[in-house]
């Protein structure tokens, strides 16, 4: 009986010890794993920030080139100063020439338009915009060319397309300090979103084996004061529906803060993330990894220790039963 009691106590002690050791091992291993994940996220965020800056500076140069093109200015003034009934002739030689000039820099734009000083579209590479009203305040950001590279731009939901939008309007002068109208550029935010696209898990640029998968995305507040993606995520359906997003990281970033931490993402999943406010676009860049993925190796290690302890516990219990059975076996005469 004493032998059986010893083996049972040993079994319980082994199981309890392995449980404590596995939990402590898991918790101790989590710290370095979280630090490693954050270090990796900082590198990723810096790279994506640099790519966004490079993309934007390229577009700023293209807009500057357009505004300094004598042919563009000449054709624009011809349209802006024309009589109302002749402005809307989209097949006129002037309109076709202007469209050809602007199309050369169309890569990052949804459209390029000419606006009167009152905000009426009198020319556009998007013919559906003709004669539409595009306010020069609240939504479209009206500014001078030297201000374009660093001025925060308004982010809003386009009432026609329902898509998040950023539009800039730069003056075209008929004389010093005398505006004839504006060149308005509607940016293609999908191209901006492409700058922070994460590599496919099967590509050569994917995170190395053992590293947690990273999700990067850009969000901004619309004119309805709701946070949303700036463009449909990659591989989303054609009729993608933008939904409000909310998390501690999103709120802090859109309030102009940058930092890192542990929080629930918009889907309620625990993540470790780093967030950065991008003042140029009034946008937040977030780089996150699921805690489940980050802690996978420490969880596996803890489970292995617990399983080993459980096996030892069962072995001890089995030994106790075997010894007890042997001691209680009747002695043959």
Where are these regions (language model features)?
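Alpha-helical transmembrane segments and their helix-membrane boundary motifs
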Residues: 2-16, 303-309, 323-324
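Juxtamembrane extracytoplasmic/periplasmic/luminal helical "stalk" adjacent to the first N-terminal
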Residues: 6-10, 14-88, 103-110, 164-168
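Short glycine-/small-residue motifs
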Residues: 63, 124, 181-182, 284
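Amphipathic coiled-coil signal-relay and dimerization helices
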Residues: 74-76, 119-126, 225-233, 274-275
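Extracytoplasmic/periplasmic sensor domains and loops in membrane signaling proteins
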Residues: 85-99, 124-157, 198, 202, ...
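Solvent-exposed, extracytoplasmic
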Residues: 87-108, 127-129, 137-140, 166, ...
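Extracellular/periplasmic juxtamembrane segments that couple receptor/chemosensory ectodomains to their
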Residues: 172-181, 221-223, 234-304
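Cytoplasm-proximal transmembrane signaling helix
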Residues: 284-286, 291-332
């Amino acid at each position: 009986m004493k032998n059986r009691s010893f083996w049972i106590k040993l079994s319980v002690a082994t199981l309890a010890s392995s449980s404590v050791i596995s939990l402590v091992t898991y918790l101790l291993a989590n710290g370095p794993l979280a630090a490693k994940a954050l270090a990796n996220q900082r590198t990723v965020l810096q790279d994506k920030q640099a790519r966004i800056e490079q993309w934007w500076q390229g577009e700023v140069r293209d807009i500057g080139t357009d505004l300094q093109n004598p042919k563009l200015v000449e054709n624009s003034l011809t349209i802006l100063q024309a009589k109302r009934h002749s402005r809307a002739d989209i097949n006129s030689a002037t309109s076709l020439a202007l469209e050809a000039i602007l199309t050369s820099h169309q890569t990052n734009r949804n459209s390029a338009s000419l606006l009167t000083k009152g905000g009426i579209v009198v020319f556009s590479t998007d013919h559906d915009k003709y004669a539409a009203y595009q306010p020069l305040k609240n939504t479209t950001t009206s500014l001078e060319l030297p201000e374009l590279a660093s001025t925060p731009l308004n982010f809003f939901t386009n009432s026609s397309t329902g898509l998040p939008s950023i539009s800039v309007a730069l003056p075209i002068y008929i004389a010093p300090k005398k505006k004839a109208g504006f060149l308005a550029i509607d940016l293609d935010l999908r191209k901006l979103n492409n700058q922070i696209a994460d590599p496919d898990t099967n590509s050569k640029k994917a995170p190395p084996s053992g590293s947690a998968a990273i999700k990067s995305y850009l969000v901004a507040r619309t004119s309805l004061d709701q946070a949303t993606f700036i463009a449909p995520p990659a591989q989303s359906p054609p009729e993608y529906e933008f939904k409000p997003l909310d998390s501690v990281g999103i709120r802090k970033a859109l309030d102009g803060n940058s930092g890192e931490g542990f929080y629930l993402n918009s889907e309620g999943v625990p993540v470790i993330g780093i967030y950065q406010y991008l003042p140029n676009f009034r946008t937040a860049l977030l780089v996150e990894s699921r805690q489940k993925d980050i802690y996978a190796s420490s969880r596996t290690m803890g489970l292995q220790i617990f399983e080993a302890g459980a096996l030892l516990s069962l072995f001890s219990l089995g030994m106790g039963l075997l010894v007890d059975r042997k001691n209680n076996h009747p002695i043959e005469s």
